[in-house]
Amino acid sequence: MAKLILATFAVVFLALAATSLAGDPDMLQDVCVADYKSLRGPLRLNGIPCKRLENVTANDFFFDGLTNAGNTTNAVGSLVTAASVERLPGLNTMGVSMARIDYAPWGLSPPHTHPRATEIMFVAEGTLDVGFVTTANKLFTRTVSKGEVFVFPRGLVHFQRNSGNTSALAIAAFNSQLPGTQSIADTLFGAAPPLPSDTLARAFQVDGGMVESIKSKFPPKY
């Protein structure tokens, strides 16, 4: 656990060092702890309104959700535990967040994007095959081992796969309080309302029956 904590601090330091290129607007006050109660009303804005300073406590800046391994018993064999503004209100306006990613043996983080942030990933345990694809369809990929770091540029499709017979663990940092995640398969085949099957069939050059079969594996998430 001590090694994990040190690794976490290292990743956060690297993320903070890049705040001049943060994906979020600059903050205009010392702190702006997210006031979740305000989200119940009709007001919506690019961020979350601040809690009154007299109501802010140290717990608003604390999160222990990364201490335990995530349950990787699922179809892809991985689980992301995010420490974003949705779980850590003190991150509001800070322009950073992080996540813990647990991988079962041969587990996969399927191709996805973070539309609002660059990701820097530190491998704490195991070995991962990782990569991203540029807008020119060029793939950059390599194997990343324990103690090594890899960067995924903002908005580009990328993946990670555990290439070993044992569990793996990675810690990721983002230059946004809420980087967002779009899984390519979920987005295309599990949208609500669904994308037209003939559109997907023509895009992937397959028949409609195959599209419907794939859609059945990705129920819409509302």
From Swiss-Prot:
Pfam families according to UniProt: Cupin_1
Annotated signal sequence range: 1-22
Name under which the protein is recorded: Putative germin-like protein 3-2
Record's keyword terms, sorted: Apoplast, Disulfide bond, Glycoprotein, Manganese, Metal-binding, Secreted, Signal
CDD domains (UniProt xref): cupin_OxOx
Record GO terms (molecular function): manganese ion binding
Native source organism of the sequence: Oryza sativa subsp. japonica
Task performed by this protein: May play a role in plant defense. Probably has no oxalate oxidase activity even if the active site is conserved.
Superkingdom, natural source: Eukaryota
Family the UniProt entry places it in: Belongs to the germin family.
Glycosylation sites: 55, 71, 165
Record: residues binding Mn(2+): 112, 114, 119, 158
Residues in Cupin type-1 domain copies: 64-212
One BP annotation, GO: plasmodesmata-mediated intercellular transport
